Amino acid sequence: MVKIAFIGVGKIGQTIAYSVIFDGLASEAILYDIVPELPEKFEHELRHAIATRGLSTEVIGTNSLDDVTNADIILIMAGKPRKPGMSRRDLFIDNAKIQIDLAKQLPPKNPGALYIMVANPVDMMASVFMRFSKQFTISTGDAVETMRLRSYIAKKLKVPANKVTGYVAGEHGEDAVVLWSTVKVNGKPFEEVAKGLTKEEVENYVKSIPGEIIRVMGGTTWGPATIIKDIVRSVVFNEGRVMSIATPRTYQGEIIHISVPIVVGAEIGPSLEGVLPESDRQRLNKSVEDFYRVYKENLDHLLQTVKQ
């Protein structure tokens, strides 16, 4: 029996909750949001769909964090959404304050919960939440970029997506790093089957398509929600899938979250970072340095703001 809490049930939160619940991953689901009536009305919607499917999941919608208790997994989507032309880092201060508040309120009533950060900038928010909560936290990281990578290569080379393997690592978003040594099509290295498809084109797609989707559709939802559901599924059923999610590491004395391919199950790890070739590790190390520099600048400003 797995109890899962969904913190923030706006557009992406609703899609994630639907995906998780209808994959049979939660025996009980708690839907929380600050918007009056939203969790309650979303609860009704889900109950109608659950009845149609004949599931037994119990759903509770609430505007009170006091009702979020004894959850096994807590997914955090609460935060301001990314708007067209806005980078994920632009969101840092406002959304970090939300995570600090949640970090103070959630842990006392949810001992042993696994926290999965979804709110952007997702890796930095995971680092902020873990810093203030002292609870093990992961972020969805580059799991989404990884599937964008595979899907684009599959489309361009006209092969099924399940015939493409490979991972994206580093920070989620514009600074993500494609681990080209891991990219294979039908088991063959990318370079052998590229047929004129360049690495630059693939990388540009992976980094630019989210902004294009946001510009036209107002947000990315279905791709991320399905991938996040897969992360939850691998944890709940201890599947041990290798996924590129962001896990905590200490760098320059600060906890930061960086994505690397890692085994995801009831326990998180080990990672495959140690078996990557030097070329990939160098690019990943630079991503870590860049992430830390920007995160530390934002964190220092945040701490001054919080003190005020």
From Swiss-Prot:
Pfam family membership, one: Ldh_1_C
InterPro entries: L-lactate/malate_DH (IPR001557), Lactate/malate_DH_C (IPR022383), Lactate/malate_DH_N (IPR001236), Lactate_DH/Glyco_Ohase_4_C (IPR015955), NAD(P)-bd_dom_sf (IPR036291)
Binding site for NAD(+): G8, V9, G10, K11, I12, G13, D33, N95, V118, A119, N120
Any one GO molecular-function label of the UniProt entry: L-malate dehydrogenase (NAD+) activity
CDD domains (UniProt xref): LDH_like
Positions annotated to bind substrate: R82, R88, N120, R148
Enzyme class: oxidoreductase
GO BP annotation list: lactate metabolic process; pyruvate metabolic process; tricarboxylic acid cycle
Keyword Oxidoreductase applies: yes
Residues at the catalytic site: H172
Alphabetically ordered keywords of this record: NAD, Oxidoreductase, Tricarboxylic acid cycle
Annotated catalysed reactions: (S)-malate + NAD(+) = oxaloacetate + NADH + H(+)
Entry EC no(s): 1.1.1.37
Protein task: Catalyzes the reversible oxidation of malate to oxaloacetate.
Family of the protein in this entry: Belongs to the LDH/MDH superfamily.
Designated name of the protein: Malate dehydrogenase
Source species of the chain: Saccharolobus solfataricus (strain ATCC 35092 / DSM 1617 / JCM 11322 / P2) (Sulfolobus solfataricus)
